[in-house]
């Protein structure tokens, strides 16, 4: 809830009275009609209870698939003057926009209109009309999160991880599988359950790494520890995990005590840049962590793993990549970075593998999992919807709806090949003797 001073409250009340009698300017209406006429669905927008228009689909007899209620003209003013669609998200979180209908319909809207485009001949009229609309008593222009720290510094990375993962273990338990695996599952067939597909993923990783009893396994960014516990209990290894999430650390410590694994498994709060700089582990794995590293830090990341790996060992790196070059400027990227997942950064697989090779790794195997992540995300979105009342009680209803939209949007991104995910198996170039199976089937047996 907004905390306004007395003077701000007076201004808000006067502003609200002004908004009651404000009509939607004709030039803004024409611009919206042009912008939204090609929508593949019907969109009804109510402007602060003064005007209501339908945009999009031509069949007027059917009901709109989506309805937006903009509660104050200052939202539209801020949108046009800033030319930033994320203003709408800020307006929603402030309670100035209400949505009725299928949230998934918003995804093609964002994809169709990634930027607010105003033609030169329209710009002056729109600017004047927007400027004359009543102003909000606070700034609604969406700005990136800033903390005065260099991006991907140790402190900023830790803050970003805790922003995303420390929403509470109970929050993630509401919609993930029972093991709390927050990464792509592996489906042997489309009807496979999420729980079974996550267990299949954990076992497949262990087999790819050729884990043997007595070996030491490092998990960089171990999450809630499911993979480590699986490897310890099913393959007899000694596990060591690192995370920057305080909530994940607490959960891991509880599970280690409960399952009496203290002599075989350790999890610590540690940055990957502080890993041992000498050969320490027989095998290393990293699942869904490289997205947090940042492209400029790829050399440091791959070097840290290489230094910590014993001769003859393997490193399995599992991470999301982009199908095209990303620079963080798209609406989708900025939405995720601002509201859900700060400081995430994706690169094309070729970029990641080039850095790995330059760092001293030999690429052994590359496995594409894109359809598996689309299925995983659909399961998460469905689970989230079923547990919506519970998660809304933790996050608040509006933030919970943004999370649901995030999961649906990510599912569509993988389904439409905007994003991809790969498991890459690496070994040190200094290991001249081939000590691995001659074919992929050798890992899967």
Task: State where each predicted segment sits.
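A short glycine-rich, Lys/Arg-flanked "PGG" loop and its adjoining helix->strand segment in the class I
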Residues: 299-311
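A short acidic, Gly/Pro-enriched loop at the edge of an enzyme's catalytic core
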Residues: 273-284
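Conserved SAM-binding strand-loop segment of SAM-dependent methyltransferases
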Residues: 260-272
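Conserved SAM-binding loop of SAM-dependent methyltransferases across substrates and taxa
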Residues: 224-235
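Substrate-binding/catalytic lobe of Class I Rossmann-like enzymes that use SAM or dcSAM, i.e.
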Residues: 320-434, 440-444
């Amino acid at each position: 809830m907004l905390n306004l001073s007395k003077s701000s409250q007076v201004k808000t009340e006067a502003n609200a009275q002004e908004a009651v009698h404000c009509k939607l300017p004709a030039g803004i209406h024409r611009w919206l009609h042009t912008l939204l006429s090609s929508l593949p669905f019907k969109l009804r927008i109510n402007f602060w209870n003064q005007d209501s228009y339908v945009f999009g689909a031509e069949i007027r007899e059917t009901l709109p698939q989506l309805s937006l209620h903009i509660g104050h003209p200052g939202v539209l003013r801020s949108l046009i003057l800033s030319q930033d669609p994320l203003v709408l998200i800020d307006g929603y979180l402030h309670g100035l926009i209400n949505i009725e209908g299928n949230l998934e319909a918003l995804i093609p809207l964002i994809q169709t209109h990634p930027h607010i485009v105003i033609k030169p001949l329209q710009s002056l009229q729109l600017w004047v009309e927007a400027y004359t609309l009543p102003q909000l008593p606070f700034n609604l222009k969406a700005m990136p999160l800033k903390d005065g720290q260099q991006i991907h510094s140790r402190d900023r990375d830790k803050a970003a991880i805790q922003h995303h993962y420390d929403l509470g273990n109970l929050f993630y338990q509401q919609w993930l599988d029972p093991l709390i695996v927050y990464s792509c599952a592996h489906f042997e067939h489309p009807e496979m359950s999420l729980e079974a597909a996550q267990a299949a993923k954990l076992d497949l990783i262990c087999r790819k790494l050729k884990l043997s009893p007595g070996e030491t396994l490092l998990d960089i960014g171990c999450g809630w520890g499911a993979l480590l516990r699986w490897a310890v209990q099913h393959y007899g290894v000694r596990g060591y995990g690192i995370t920057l999430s305080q909530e994940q650390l607490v959960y891991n410590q509880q599970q280690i005590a409960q399952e009496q694994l203290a002599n075989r498994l350790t999890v610590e709060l540690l940055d990957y840049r502080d890993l041992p700089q000498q050969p320490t582990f027989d095998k290393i794995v990293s699942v869904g962590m490289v997205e947090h590293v940042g492209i400029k830090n790829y050399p440091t990341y791959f070097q840290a793993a290489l230094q910590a790996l014993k001769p003859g060992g393997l490193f399995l790196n599992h991470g999301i990549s982009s199908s095209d070059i990303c620079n963080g400027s798209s609406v989708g990227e900025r939405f995720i970075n601002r509201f859900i997942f700060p400081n995430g950064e994706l690169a094309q697989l070729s970029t990641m593998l080039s850095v790995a090779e330059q760092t001293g790794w030999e690429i052994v195997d590359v496995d594409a999992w894109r359809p598996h992540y689309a299925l995983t995300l659909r399961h998460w979105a469905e689970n989230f919807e079923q547990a919506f009342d519970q998660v809304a009680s933790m996050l608040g209803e509006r933030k919970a709806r943004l999370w649901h939209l995030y999961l649906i949007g990510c599912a569509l991104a993988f389904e439409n090949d905007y994003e991809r995910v790969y498991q890459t198996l690496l070994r040190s170039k200094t290991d001249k003797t081939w000590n691995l199976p001659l074919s992929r089937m050798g890992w899967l047996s």
